[in-house]
Amino acid sequence: MSLALLCSLLLVHGSLGEIVFRCPSCTAERQAACPKLTTSCEIVREPGCGCCPVCARQKGELCGVYTTRCGSGLRCYPSANSELPLEQLIQGLGRCENKVDLEPTMTNQESAAHSGEVNGTRSPPMKKPGKDYQYIKEIAVNKHHNNKRTRMYNTQDDPKTPHPKQSQCQQELDKVLENISRMAFHDNKGPLENLYDLKFPNCDKTGQYNLKQCHMSTHGQRGECWCVNPYTGVQIPSSDKVRGDPNCSQYYGGPELEPPTAQQK
């Protein structure tokens, strides 16, 4: 998960705008273990606090919390008509679009810090989450809660109207958002140990779990990924947690992806 996008979840109308986060140093040893790029592309650092160089996503390509960064001058935005933009970003259904200028022009040093480029073995500089992330956060959280309030209002207005039940994955996501809103911050420092412990469920368009689930990158290493049952979110026994692609497509059509039986529930 991208730490920058995670920071965007914590900004509410600028009230937490002064919280500062620092990623661990990208040592030469960690960078030496990175896989070599075989194609020519714009190079950016891995999402979150990863240290390895990866190819940036280009304009119009899908992007989200778990994907690599967009290229220079681009940001990952949810669609304008999305009812739940935050969930769209978590599902990897955003798009890399031209960055919306919502803040004064940054200095060269601030721009380099914000771009996420690989900076040798130096520690990534301390930075404040930009206002463009605050913009995404405000839209996402406001629409998320407005949608919930609308469903509650419609149910009260007409008791006979069936209320769509949230899936297990959506309920789990709501709990994570609630935990974030209740987090306490002290001395203008973000409790990174708490943030890294957060487990964002990766839900698909229908509200079920995406087959591939991942932890956010920490300590210069990409987060572990694994395959789950789309109905329960439980890790498939034969699927190991790996720092890369767990190849979840191998389970398509297999019994591992079947809904649980009444006895299993």
Swiss-Prot record:
Tissue specificity is:
In early embryos, expressed at a low level in most tissues with expression becoming abundant in the liver by 96 hours post-fertilization (hpf). The expression pattern in adults exhibits sexual dimorphism; in adult males expression is limited exclusively to the liver whereas in adult females expression is observed in the liver and other tissues including the gut, kidney, ovary and muscle.
Provide the IGFBP N-terminal domain boundaries. Answer: 19-99
Give the Polar residues compositional bias ranges. 107-122
Q: Which CDD domains match?
A: TY
InterPro entries the record matches: Growth_fac_rcpt_cys_sf, IGFBP-2, IGFBP-like, IGFBP_1-6_chordata, Insulin_GF-bd_Cys-rich_CS, Thyroglobulin_1, Thyroglobulin_1_sf
Q: Name one Pfam family in it.
A: Thyroglobulin_1
Q: Where is this region: Disordered?
A: 107-128, 144-170, 238-265
Q: Where is the Thyroglobulin type-1 domain?
A: 166-248
Keyword annotations for this protein, in alphabetical order, are: Developmental protein, Disulfide bond, Growth factor binding, Growth regulation, Secreted, Signal
Protein's GO biological process: negative regulation of cell population proliferation; negative regulation of developmental growth; negative regulation of DNA replication; regulation of insulin-like growth factor receptor signaling pathway; sprouting angiogenesis
Give GO cellular component annotations, separated by semicolons: extracellular region; extracellular space
Disulfide pattern: C23-C49, C26-C51, C34-C52, C41-C55, C63-C76, C70-C96, C169-C203, C214-C225, C227-C248
Q: Does the keyword 4Fe-4S apply?
A: no
Q: How does it assemble?
A: Interacts with igf2. Interacts with igf1.
General function of this protein: IGF-binding proteins prolong the half-life of the IGFs and have been shown to either inhibit or stimulate the growth promoting effects of the IGFs on cell culture. They alter the interaction of IGFs with their cell surface receptors.
Q: What is this protein called?
A: Insulin-like growth factor-binding protein 2-B
Species for this entry: Danio rerio
Task: Recite the lineage of the species.
Answer: Eukaryota, Metazoa, Chordata, Craniata, Vertebrata
Gene behind this protein: igfbp2b
